[in-house]
Amino acid sequence: MGGRNVGRAAALRARSVAFPSVAGFCIATAALIVGLALAAGMARAQDLIVAHGISTFGDLKYPADFPHLDYVNPNAPKGGEISEWAPGGFDSMNPYSVKGRAAALASAPFENILTGVADEIGSAYCLLCSTLEYPADRSFVIFNLRPEARFSDGSPLTAADVVFSYKMFLTKGLTDFRTVLAQQVQGAEALDAHRVKFTFKPGVPTRDLPQDVGALPILSQAHYEANKLDLEEPGMVPFLGSGPYVLENAEAGSSVTYRRNPDYWGADLPIAKGKSNFDRIRIEYFGDSAVAFEGFKGGAYTFRNENSSRVWATQYDFPALAAGHVVKAELPSGTKANGQGFLFNLRREKFQDPRVREAIALMFNFEWSNETLFYGLYSRINSVWENSWLAAMGVPSAAEVALLQPLVDQGLLQAGILTDEPVMGPASGATQLDRRNLRRASALLDAAGWMPGGDGVRRNAAGEPLTVAFLNDDPSFERVINPYVENLKSLGVDARMESIDQAQMEARTRPPSYDFDMIVGNARSSYVSGSDLMQYYGSETADVSAFNVMGLKSPAVDRMIALVMAAKSNDDLTVATQALDRVLRAERFWVPQWFKATHTVAYFDMYEHPETLPPYALGELEFWWFNADKAAALKAAGALR
């Protein structure tokens, strides 16, 4: 696709990590620390902090008696339908298994004990619980569940369901997640019908753990057992959750529709006011983005997050837009970049040498691509935490050096990391093939023992050619990959693109297969990182992780992850994350791509949103609403069926 951003499509089709929050973050999207103030609605009882929520460092933004979130319209009307698209197909309603292809938004019916908000980083507020209790050292946490909480069939949600859900994810969750969970959580117990306690293992960093377990999706034990469901297996019978939406209809490979539960137990909670406003959320499936765009123009679905710069710049000239029936808008986004890039499969021997990876990266010409293919709409990604204060910049600070020096002394890092600026994408010229970068890449491959032969193809001492295959399941992305392939061929690399469908892509990039050379994916991160980093970049989970698809195994990265997890203040966390960013970038496990700092959206003119959007979410499915009068006008004009 002409400058696609894979994050949106991937988010719709990806299965959820075992402990997703409502805001869509993975486990440990926020962390915790001591010293939370009484002014934030907390009180001490028997040496426990009792609170309506928890914050990483400092006070919570919202007090215990807040009426609603600042960024919602508490009087937003309920009704109508919003529809979007997803690529490929699906054959399962289980978002927590690597088997099968889960439907888009399959985790939407489930709620967490705690939930994040879109205008505050590092916080979580009670949702299924009314309060939580924890000691200053966070060695355990007790959640006081709301007695009124109900599953969507009306049955009560109890502490027994929480313990059951924990045990299911511990024994049947994604392998990388349960590996991390088993290292950190000693156990869960129901103290009574509405009190559940999680105890953490001694000696592990506990800063994140109350919020980690608070992000547990809660499943109905009775429904699970009565239907003989299995968290590890795909299936079209969904688990029973307590959320505001339930599955209405699923046509495998075609569409999936969720309807708002009119009897949703939590509708009047302050945390829920002004949210979940649509009666229905429908996802239509298409083979690729080009076909999906034609469907949008014809009204097959009504809201489109445009991830193609080419389409955005050249193809929004259809009749519905000209007639004012469709709104085309760029809305502000304060979020960091999603880490999109070409990912190496580091399990392949040919990619073990960082000089090879650096040489291949030199052949991607971002500047030419942005001007020629992307209409100048993108900025380059350099950092795993691009477009945030967590990105490493300039030479390391003294505080960063203090963290990095021991790793250099132990031979885990090159000494240059202490004095050099972080690894940046190579600057390239205006022509597709930058000759200066070609010479640099040639020297690197020569030094790595990959020498050009009489046919121009580089081979190692054993006579094996240097081959690079790009797996691609999006036809519109071919025009991005093909020039890269041509540049690599000029370097003597036997490069090619291998086109496959979405089902094949998922099968070949999941554990234990990992059958690829390079793919387009994401270097994941969160604003307040913790044990999620072990899933994304940790050595221990590299061969079982659904997220560390590149197979990164680095003792230096592991040590830095431990320092991030152990940070005791906001300043310490920032410094440790910036230092980790330097180390990750030095590993050269990816060829970073691009991002834009706005939401480019188009939608039929029957949706409305708060005047000021929150910085960390577009929220069209969460807190936008439906204007029935505008919808009727569109139908009267023949713009919608």
Task: Indicate residue ranges for each PLM-predicted region.
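Aromatic-rich, solvent-exposed beta-strand/loop patch
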Residues: 126-130, 152, 157, 199-219, ...
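Gly/Pro-rich hinge or "lid" segments in bacterial periplasmic/extracellular proteins
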Residues: 61, 89, 107-122, 213-282, ...
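Ligand-site clamp/hinge motif
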Residues: 146, 233, 266-317, 358, ...
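Surface-exposed binding/hinge segments that line
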Residues: 144, 179-227, 242-251, 394-410
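N-terminal lobe/hinge region of extracytoplasmic solute-binding protein
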Residues: 45-137, 144, 167, 174, ...
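Detector for C-terminal structural segments
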Residues: 24, 47, 86, 90, ...
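Extracellular/periplasmic solute-recognition and catalytic clefts
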Residues: 187-189, 248-259, 284-348, 355-359, ...
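Aromatic- and charge-enriched surface segment that lines or borders ligand/interaction sites
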Residues: 71-77, 98-105, 131-175, 189-191, ...
